[in-house]
């Protein structure tokens, strides 16, 4: 699978992901970019799950952002509704982590839109390791959001066999 982590701190929000794509227990590619900017660079998003499925969801989510003039929560809820009710979309297997200057959300294929505690998101096979590392760093250091995300991904990559050390990182700054 993969690891995606999002951290928000001191006027910065980061989403970072590794680059490993696997087919069963075989590494197919090591430099997949699972994190990208959407909606005129005002939203960042990362995915865990099937690559083709995730790119389809990115496109649909960007359309929802355009329909709702960039309102992240409304777009996320509308995508989740469609994902849950559309027969074809229901077959897509992926999780999305999305963020803008006001919110960080997880969108699932079950129709869930979750705003996590402490604006910390970690999804994918290495998610629990990245979440534990990021939480410890948030609570016990003054590292930046970007540094925390990078270190959390490094730790997850050391432990999870489906996570590598090729990182894609996107960051938004806002007035805290």
From Swiss-Prot:
Allosterically activated by HslU binding. One of its GO terms (cellular component) is proteasome core complex. GO terms for molecular function: ATP binding; identical protein binding; magnesium ion binding; protein domain specific binding; threonine-type endopeptidase activity. It catalyses: ATP-dependent cleavage of peptide bonds with broad specificity. CDD domains: protease_HslV. Changing residue 2 to S: 80% reduced protease activity in the absence of HslU. Almost no effect in the presence of HslU. The keyword Magnesium does not apply. GO terms for biological process: cellular response to heat; protein denaturation; proteolysis; proteolysis involved in protein catabolic process; response to heat. It is found in: Cytoplasm. InterPro entries: ATP-dep_Prtase_HsIV_su, Ntn_hydrolases_N, Proteasome_sua/b, Proteasome_suB-type. Induction: By heat shock. Keywords: Allosteric enzyme, Cytoplasm, Hydrolase, Metal-binding, Protease, Sodium, Stress response, Threonine protease. Changing residue 160 to A/S: No protease activity. Cannot form complexes with HslU. It is an enzyme of class 3 (hydrolase). Optimum temperature is 55 degrees Celsius. A double ring-shaped homohexamer of HslV is capped on each side by a ring-shaped HslU homohexamer. The assembly of the HslU/HslV complex is dependent on binding of ATP. This is ATP-dependent protease subunit HslV. It comes from Escherichia coli (strain K12). The lineage of its organism: Bacteria, Pseudomonadati, Pseudomonadota, Gammaproteobacteria, Enterobacterales.
